């Protein structure tokens, strides 16, 4: 027989050792199911199985080919039985031990002792001298069940009188060897507790050194302390089922490590796992089939496209995108890039762009307005205490200056209704009171040059009325001028922005000229002058 390079070689004998686990045998059941699913030859070619306590029961079931589902169903019933009483498994009315014996009598075949003889090694602790005894010879099914019962018996926990095997009293083998037959060089060790075993939970230890207890290596971690408690006093079934899946995953990780060792070997003499004949490579390596990976890739690409789509989109003609704005036929940027908030700050008539003539026959509609987004102005201190400034909802486009400037002598025109004007001019975003008379013309002439000649005649009158009625409002007006002195205009790429820049530029020059000659008290009218 050739020398074995790595334990688990199917061409040379190897062994599997199960540690004591108590109620945490869910973990070992998950590991056995993983080996059956991914590496069935590993269980078939193993010539020795060793176990103690509940691990001995798992080993016997694995040798006899009994499904772990039946064992887990009985274990679920036993956990529910233990949860009924306050003392749990220490209660005298607990029937957990009797339930397990009845389960073994029911599921084990009659010739199970023949199959397990020489192959199953059960670890026991002799009561008289406390020595560890490993038995592997059975003459009947009852003798096999008695050996398993002695290996699981914990004094006081399971009863007061220990059972006997061949006339000698034995107790749980975990007291003298938690990991049975760990000295076997070809043994693949499976443990519920984190340590140096091949298949076991991997925790982050609190200290770097392991400690030995019951002739077994343990990591000193909070998780291990919790596992020791759960082994004797079972937690909820949800936690126990998590132990099952954890055992399955740890067995898969072990197979991956073995595959890496085999693939990186230069001589290829490390037989396990000989992936083409020994293990299902797709499942052991965690590779997904192409048919399964394609839908996930498409879904991932769709999610990436959906994440980047709202930043910039093409709006078709006539589609308002949920708002009442004008139809746009060119690609526009969304509200996220145009401005942070619509124009909602009070702006004096000096900083307002020149008003466009209103239609005399039809009310003002949004369909005739150009698709231009006006600057976002931060809200300065209000010039009039107690004035409320409503802001348009985010779904509506910002109001243009043509909608803001209206004559105060006539009813203010709005989108849906008309309201009489108050004697004090309102500084809201919809109307700005100013005693100016505007010539009426059709809205079709909107792109034409605005009437700049009338700007110098009407604005001094508006400023004079505002100052004469409330002189203290002049200081905030200067502050507003400084705030909006450099407007930031965001407009559609399809529109020409020259006329907007001209209007703002002329308005700014005229405003500064008017400020220089502006009197603090009302006086005679100054002669009108045209903008240079």
UniProtKB/Swiss-Prot annotation:
It is found in: Cytoplasm. It comes from the Eukaryota. CDD domains: Pat_PNPLA1. PROSITE patterns: PNPLA. Induction: Up-regulated upon induced differentiation of keratinocytes. It is an enzyme of class 2 (transferase). The keyword DNA repair does not apply. This is Omega-hydroxyceramide transacylase. Residues 290-457, 489-532 are annotated as: Disordered. It is linked to Ichthyosis, congenital, autosomal recessive 10: A form of autosomal recessive congenital ichthyosis, a disorder of keratinization with abnormal differentiation and desquamation of the epidermis, resulting in abnormal skin scaling over the whole body. The main skin phenotypes are lamellar ichthyosis (LI) and non-bullous congenital ichthyosiform erythroderma (NCIE), although phenotypic overlap within the same patient or among patients from the same family can occur. Expressed in the digestive system. Expressed in the epidermis of skin keratinocytes. Strongly expressed in the granular layer. Expressed in the upper epidermis and eccrine sweat glands of the dermis and in the region of keratin filament bundles, which is more pronounced in upper epidermal layers and in the lower cornified layers. One of its GO terms (cellular component) is cytoplasm. Gene3D superfamilies: Cytosolic phospholipase A2 catalytic domain. Omega-hydroxyceramide transacylase involved in the synthesis of omega-O-acylceramides (esterified omega-hydroxyacyl-sphingosine; EOS), which are extremely hydrophobic lipids involved in skin barrier formation. Catalyzes the last step of the synthesis of omega-O-acylceramides by transferring linoleic acid from triglycerides to an omega-hydroxyceramide. Omega-O-acylceramides, are required for the biogenesis of lipid lamellae in the stratum corneum and the formation of the cornified lipid envelope which are essential for the epidermis barrier function.
């Amino acid at each position: 027989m050739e020398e074995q390079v790595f334990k688990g070689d199917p061409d040379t004998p190897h062994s599997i050792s199960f540690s004591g686990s108590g109620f945490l045998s869910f973990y070992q059941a998950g590991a056995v199911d993983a080996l059956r699913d991914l590496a069935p030859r590993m269980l078939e070619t193993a010539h020795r199985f060793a176990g103690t306590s509940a691990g001995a029961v798992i080993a016997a079931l694995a040798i006899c080919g009994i499904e772990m589902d039946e064992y887990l169903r009985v274990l679920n019933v036993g956990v529910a039985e233990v949860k009924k009483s306050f003392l749990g498994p220490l209660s005298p009315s607990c029937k957990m031990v009797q339930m397990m014996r009845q389960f073994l009598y029911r599921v084990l075949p009659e010739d199970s002792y023949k199959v397990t003889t020489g192959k199953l090694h059960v670890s026991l602790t002799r009561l008289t001298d406390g020595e560890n005894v490993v038995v592997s010879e059975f003459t009947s099914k009852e003798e096999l069940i008695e050996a398993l019962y002695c290996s699981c018996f914990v004094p006081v926990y399971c009863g007061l009188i220990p059972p006997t095997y061949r006339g000698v009293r034995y107790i749980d083998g975990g007291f003298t060897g938690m990991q049975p037959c760990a000295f076997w060089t070809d043994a693949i060790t499976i443990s519920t507790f984190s340590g140096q075993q091949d298949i076991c939970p991997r925790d982050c230890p609190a200290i770097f050194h392991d400690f030995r207890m019951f002739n077994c290596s343990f990591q000193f971690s909070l998780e291990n302390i919790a596992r020791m408690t759960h082994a004797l006093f079972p937690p909820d079934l949800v936690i126990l089922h998590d132990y099952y899946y954890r055992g399955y995953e740890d067995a898969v990780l072990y197979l991956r490590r073995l595959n890496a060792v085999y693939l990186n070997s230069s001589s290829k003499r490390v037989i396990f796992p000989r992936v083409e004949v020994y293990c299902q490579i797709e499942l052991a390596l965690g590779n997904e089939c192409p048919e399964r990976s394609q839908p996930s890739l498409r879904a991932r690409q769709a999610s990436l496209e959906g994440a980047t789509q709202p930043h910039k989109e093409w709006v078709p003609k006539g589609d308002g995108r949920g708002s009442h704005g004008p139809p746009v036929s060119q690609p526009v940027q969304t509200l996220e890039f145009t401005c942070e908030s619509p124009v909602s700050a009070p702006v004096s008539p000096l900083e307002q762009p020149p008003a466009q003539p209103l239609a005399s026959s039809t009310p003002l509609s949004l369909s005739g307005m150009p698709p231009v987004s006006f600057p976002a102005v931060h809200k300065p201190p209000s010039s009039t205490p107690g004035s409320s400034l409503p802001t348009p909802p985010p779904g509506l486009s910002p109001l243009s200056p043509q909608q803001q400037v209206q004559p105060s002598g006539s009813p203010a025109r709005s989108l849906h209704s008309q309201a009489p004007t108050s004697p004090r001019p309102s500084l809201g975003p919809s109307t700005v009171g100013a005693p100016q008379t505007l010539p009426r013309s059709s809205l079709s002439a909107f792109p034409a040059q605005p009437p700049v000649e009338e700007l110098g005649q009407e604005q001094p009158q508006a400023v004079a009325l505002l100052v004469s009625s409330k002189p203290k409002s002049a200081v905030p007006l200067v502050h507003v001028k400084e705030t909006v002195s450099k407007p930031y205009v965001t407009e559609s790429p399809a529109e020409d922005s020259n006329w907007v820049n001209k209007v703002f530029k002329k308005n700014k020059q005229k405003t500064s000229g008017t400020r220089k000659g502006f009197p603090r008290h009302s006086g005679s009218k100054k002669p009108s002058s045209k903008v240079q």
